[in-house]
């Protein structure tokens, strides 16, 4: 059986990864997300944007995968599992998942903004957050940026195509910790439902997907996932 997991910020929040909606450290609590997550913001103030993402890189590196990440990884022992994530952390990989597609890029990969070359150098140390820091410079003289998707940028083709295939070939799709409002990612469970596939939503809050999902559970990821596969036949029978 192939299980495709669509994961969002909620699964990593349980590990202590803050989202844009959380109160962050005092330095960044009032920052406009567009100011630090757009090409416009990068072009206006690359030093500020680089400082914010470098701090998040180190902050994410300090947190550990939680029970939900470990459960999804353990499913690979007896299932074909694909993980499509909107998260830019590496918690799925550190938990042991091997087929992970990052729709919004990764904060653990960096590239030149000018020539696109991958950055293999050392990152500057950052023991505490600062407002600005100079980005590294590529040999072509371009600035090094995080390999994440900013507002207005397209999703990476390879990750998107693999994600579409992962959903179209799945026997069941599990949507975990995502608000289901950010497109085109939010269209993936809709496509699965249109194809007649069971879609299980796991989210402590209702989302736009809740009414149409085959099963919608008001539970956190770490509460629901460890027993979800055992409960699956009963849940699907109840929804039929």
Swiss-Prot record:
Gene3D superfamilies: SIR2/SIRT2 'Small Domain, TPP-binding domain. Keywords: Cytoplasm, DNA damage, DNA repair, Metal-binding, NAD, Transferase, Zinc. It catalyses: N(6)-succinyl-L-lysyl-[protein] + NAD(+) + H2O = 2''-O-succinyl-ADP-D-ribose + nicotinamide + L-lysyl-[protein]; N(6)-acetyl-L-lysyl-[protein] + NAD(+) + H2O = 2''-O-acetyl-ADP-D-ribose + nicotinamide + L-lysyl-[protein]. The active site is at residue 104. Binds 1 zinc ion per subunit. Substrate binds at residues 53, 56. GO terms for biological process: cellular response to ionizing radiation; double-strand break repair via nonhomologous end joining. One of its GO terms (molecular function) is protein-succinyllysine desuccinylase activity. It comes from the Bacteria. Interacts with both Ku and LigD; may form a trimeric complex during NHEJ. This is NAD-dependent protein deacylase Sir2. It comes from Mycolicibacterium smegmatis (strain ATCC 700084 / mc(2)155). The gene is sir2.
């Amino acid at each position: 059986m192939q299980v495709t997991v669509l994961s969002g910020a909620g699964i990593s929040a349980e590990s202590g990864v803050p989202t844009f909606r959380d109160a962050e450290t005092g330095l960044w609590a009032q920052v406009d997300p567009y100011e630090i997550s757009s090409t416009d913001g990068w072009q206006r103030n690359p030093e500020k944007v680089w400082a914010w993402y470098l701090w998040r890189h180190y902050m994410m590196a300090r947190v550990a995968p939680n029970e939900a990440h470990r459960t999804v990884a353990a499913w690979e022992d007896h299932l074909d599992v694909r993980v499509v994530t909107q998260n830019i952390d590496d918690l799925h990989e550190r938990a042991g998942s091997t087929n992970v597609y990052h729709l919004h890029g990764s904060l653990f990969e960096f590239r030149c903004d000018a020539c696109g070359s991958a950055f293999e150098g050392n990152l500057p140390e950052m023991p505490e957050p600062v407002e600005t820091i100079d980005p590294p410079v590529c040999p072509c003289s371009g600035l090094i940026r995080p390999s994440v998707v900013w507002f207005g940028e397209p999703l990476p083709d390879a990750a998107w195509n693999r994600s579409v295939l992962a959903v179209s070939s799945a026997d069941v799709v599990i949507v975990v910790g995502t608000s289901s409002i950010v497109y085109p990612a939010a269209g993936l469970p809709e496509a699965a439902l249109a194809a007649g596939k069971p879609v299980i939503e796991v989210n402590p809050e209702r989302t736009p997907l809740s009414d149409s999902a085959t099963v919608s559970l008001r539970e956190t990821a770490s509460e629901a996932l460890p027993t979800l596969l055992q409960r699956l036949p009963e849940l699907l029978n109840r929804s039929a």
